[in-house]
Amino acid sequence: MSTIDDLPPLREVIQRHDLSARKSLGQNFLLDLNLTTRIARAAGPLEDSTVIEVGPGPGGLTRALLALGAKRVIAIERDERALGALAEISAHYPGRLDIVCADAMTYDPRPLLGGARAKIVANLPYNIATPLLIGWLETDPWPPWYDCLVLMFQREVAERIVATEDDEAYGRLGVLANWRAQTKMLFDISPAAFVPPPKVTSSVVRLIPRDEPEPCNRRMLEQVTAAAFGQRRKMLRQSLKSLGVDPARLAAAAGVEPTRRAETIPVAGFVAMARELANIRGIKSEC
């Protein structure tokens, strides 16, 4: 039996349900229940919370969330082979686990929430982790339907999420993430903790949505960061030419020196340039 509940060990569950990880689904199962518990705890108190989990697989993190008292867990799993293992967990925690067999890239869990906000806690499949996060960060209207994200990524991606100006990993993802949320790298997880072990170290990141991010039009922000980081080694007066406006005037009007490079501009600078671009184009700046 496990250390967090009296359900069978995860290795036994995987063997009984023939849950060999599939590379095509980006699966790497985390079997150490001490680590899954640590991830679940990072989301804060769970007793009054509904938690969305993406890609539960054999249910290691699912079990940790429920054992720590999550009021309700909605597990979104594309792999039908895992449904039997998840059903066993549901029987052990009656009325607290909803299992949804769907592709998280297209499935919208909000109708299940009844207007309440949720936490999203997941060991995300590597092959969909970044687009899922971007989709959640681009949620409109804002504040979003979730109040906390605790997610596992490849360390390289995690570094991009939490990066700020002058960091080597700073780019479009860091601007979007830190504009709309407070981000923090929590801890690393060795490849040896997974079955099969990935080739890279994984990292757990927590994002807390900002109630009121600096106002700007999100699409204008995307265009500014795409232009600036698309030629990140060039000065803004050159890299922003693709926007179809005078780049030096755009930057200067936003209070940003046109001779600076994208990697040195803080999030507030990009937001200011996005607002100025929206003004030039006659587009509403509020997000």
From Swiss-Prot:
InterPro entries: KsgA/Erm, rRNA_Ade_diMease-like_C, rRNA_Ade_Mease_Trfase_CS, rRNA_Ade_methylase_Trfase_N, rRNA_adenine_dimethylase, SAM-dependent_MTases_sf. It is an enzyme of class 2 (transferase). CDD domains: AdoMet_MTases. It catalyses: adenosine(1518)/adenosine(1519) in 16S rRNA + 4 S-adenosyl-L-methionine = N(6)-dimethyladenosine(1518)/N(6)-dimethyladenosine(1519) in 16S rRNA + 4 S-adenosyl-L-homocysteine + 4 H(+). Disulfide bonds: none annotated. Coiled coil: none annotated. Keywords: Cytoplasm, Methyltransferase, RNA-binding, rRNA processing, S-adenosyl-L-methionine, Transferase. S-adenosyl-L-methionine binds at N28, L30, G55, E77, D103, N123. One of its GO terms (cellular component) is cytosol. Its EC number is 2.1.1.182. Belongs to the class I-like SAM-binding methyltransferase superfamily. rRNA adenine N(6)-methyltransferase family. RsmA subfamily. NCBIfam families: ksgA (TIGR00755). Specifically dimethylates two adjacent adenosines (A1518 and A1519) in the loop of a conserved hairpin near the 3'-end of 16S rRNA in the 30S particle. May play a critical role in biogenesis of 30S subunits. This is Ribosomal RNA small subunit methyltransferase A. It comes from Rhodopseudomonas palustris (strain BisA53).
